[in-house]
Amino acid sequence: MDHIYDVIILGAGPAGLSAGLYAGRSRLDTLIIEKGQAGGQIINTDEIENYPGQIVEGETGVSLVRRMYEQTEQFGAEHVRDTITDVELNGEIKVLTGEKDTYQAKNIIIATGAYARPIGCKGEGQFRGKGVSYCATCDA
């Protein structure tokens, strides 16, 4: 807990990885904390055609996230997998307590993303991906 980062980014989806890339490029001592697998919702995407940046033909969510993750590492960002259970944002040094460790930083970026929220109607789970979707443009 003695290490004080310039910035800690909560979340390793596209927004968190982008923030980590730019923080690293700016030579900030950067830590990205993700509670699960890096990538967020985009890892469930089979084909990406309309994402800003250098997309290769047949790009999947997994391949894009892998490249983004590697870029953050190339610019010096560290990654840990932990679930943050408490935050103390008062004062110059912010303290984040996780299930595995405690982290300190001068700045925090919250990029925890979103998730599909089922409404709980009859047949919703049964027909997910078969007419029930959480992506309007996917069904267009």
Which functions belong to the PLM regions below?
Residues I4-L31:
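N-terminal Rossmann-like FAD-binding beta1-loop-alpha1 element of flavoenzymes
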Residues A15, Q37-A38, Y115:
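Conserved Rossmann-like nucleotide-cofactor binding loop
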Residues S26, I48-E49, E124-R128:
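Glycine-rich, phosphate-binding/catalytic loops in enzymes
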Residues D29-K35, I42:
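Short beta-strand "acidic-cap" motif of Rossmann-like dinucleotide-binding folds
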